[in-house]
């Protein structure tokens, strides 16, 4: 309640974040209310950041961006998992180097428990871990991975001496330090979850390469991943759609909680269970496994109903039409005629990424 109250009080604001469609076709009133409330709070949060940092300086956590504010929103750490960079910045008017130093150390040594960190408040709730999430993904100025506080502190001091930059937003001076992740940072993150992926793949009969491709496309293996539609975790599961469908299929009532979906193993299990539901239930009428895979991938992003409606408003007729087409024609149709540009691109991205995992 304390964290929610802090967010609710974050006054005035802007709107900015990556779009993400709701996974699944179950849209109920409770989901709409929750989403509208979340949108309002996100708008307030963004507006507060704009007031402090400036119009072009709004940064909010997303599926592939870890953003954490501290020091009354005057300091922030941003990990861009696509670009492979860590940027720590502050607008603190006094002792900016000290603020940066603390944030650098905390970011380098933070654990991989997203449920313990509130990305929408300035509470300094980042716990230093003996198994840092970024261990092996970043090395210090001597080329060594960073596990202990002493090494992180020395590296922070080195960065402040050699890489400190400043710029003006028109109102304040922004001091920053940028650190590059190692070139194979994506593979290092993916490796953390291979065992969980293998277990879920066997449990639900889903190809490991598809699960990994979905994870890379959705979150770039960022366990802290959130979206504007409140999709959570590595596979970007929405509680009130895909999450609820999976719980219902497993004989559970209600919806999975945020802490449940922020747990990597639970998130991967739920996302994979939903892929199996799409494959075996919602799109089970598609005979050709390759055509069905294309449909499942697209449906994971935009829903099974929207996939079938590309071919016909009648679900049975849609499946019959798909069954009369070659897999190549199904792919071409979904990547050119699906009403959502995001879903069209999604199939292209996931299919290409899955091919790369099959070659490994």
Curated annotation (Swiss-Prot):
Disulfide bonds: none annotated. A lipid is attached at residue 17 (S-diacylglycerol cysteine). One of its GO terms (biological process) is cell wall organization. It is a lipid-anchor. PROSITE patterns: PROKAR_LIPOPROTEIN, TRANSGLYCOSYLASE. It is found in: Cell outer membrane. InterPro entries: Lysozyme-like_dom_sf (IPR023346), Murein_transglycosylaseC (IPR023664), Murein_transglycosylaseC_N (IPR024570), Transglyc_AS (IPR000189), Transglycosylase_SLT_dom_1 (IPR008258). GO terms for cellular component: cell outer membrane. Residues 1-16 form the signal peptide. GO terms for molecular function: hydrolase activity, acting on glycosyl bonds; peptidoglycan lytic transglycosylase activity. Its EC number is 4.2.2.n1. The keyword Isomerase does not apply. A lipid is attached at residue 17 (N-palmitoyl cysteine). Keywords: Cell outer membrane, Cell wall biogenesis/degradation, Lipoprotein, Lyase, Membrane, Palmitate, Signal. SUPFAM superfamilies: Lysozyme-like. Murein-degrading enzyme. May play a role in recycling of muropeptides during cell elongation and/or cell division. HAMAP family: MltC (MF_01616). PANTHER family: MEMBRANE-BOUND LYTIC MUREIN TRANSGLYCOSYLASE C (PTHR37423:SF2), SOLUBLE LYTIC MUREIN TRANSGLYCOSYLASE-RELATED (PTHR37423). Belongs to the transglycosylase Slt family. NCBIfam families: PRK11671.1. This is Membrane-bound lytic murein transglycosylase C. It comes from Citrobacter koseri (strain ATCC BAA-895 / CDC 4225-83 / SGSC4696).
């Amino acid at each position: 309640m304390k964290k929610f109250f802090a967010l609710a009080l974050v006054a005035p604001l802007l709107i900015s974040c990556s779009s993400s469609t709701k996974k699944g076709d179950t849209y109920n009133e409770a989901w709409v209310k929750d989403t509208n409330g979340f949108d309002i709070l996100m708008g307030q949060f963004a507006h507060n950041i704009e007031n402090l940092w400036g119009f072009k300086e709004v940064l909010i956590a997303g599926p592939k961006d870890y953003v954490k504010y501290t020091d009354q929103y005057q300091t922030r750490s941003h990990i861009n998992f696509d670009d492979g960079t860590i940027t720590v910045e502050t607008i603190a008017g006094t002792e900016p180097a000290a603020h940066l130093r603390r944030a650098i150390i905390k970011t380098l040594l933070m654990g991989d428990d997203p449920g313990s960190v509130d990305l929408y408040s300035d509470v300094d709730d980042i716990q230093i871990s003996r198994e840092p999430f970024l261990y092996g993904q970043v090395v210090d100025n001597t080329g060594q991975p960073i596990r202990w506080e002493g090494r992180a502190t020395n590296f922070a001091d080195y960065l402040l001496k050699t890489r400190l930059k400043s710029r003006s937003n028109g109102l304040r001076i922004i001091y920053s330090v940028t650190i590059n992740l190692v070139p194979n940072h994506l593979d290092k993150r993916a490796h953390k979850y291979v065992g969980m992926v293998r277990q879920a793949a066997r449990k639900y009969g889903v190809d490991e390469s598809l699960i990994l491709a979905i994870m890379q496309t959705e979150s770039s293996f960022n366990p802290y991943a959130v979206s504007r539609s409140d999709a959570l975790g590595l596979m970007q599961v929405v509680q009130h759609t895909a999450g609820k469908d999976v719980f219902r299929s497993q004989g559970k009532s209600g919806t999975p909680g945020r802490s449940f979906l922020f747990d990597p193993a639970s998130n991967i299990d739920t996302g994979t269970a939903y892929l199996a539901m799409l494959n075996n239930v919602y799109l089970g009428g598609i005979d050709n496994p390759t055509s069905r895979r294309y449909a499942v991938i697209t449906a994971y992003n935009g829903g099974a109903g929207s996939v079938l409606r590309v071919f016909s408003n009648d679900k049975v007729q849609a499946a019959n039409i798909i069954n009369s087409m070659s897999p190549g024609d199904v792919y071409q149709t979904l990547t050119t005629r699906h009403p959502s540009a995001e879903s069209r691109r999604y199939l292209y991205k996931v299919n290409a990424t899955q091919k790369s995992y099959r070659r490994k």
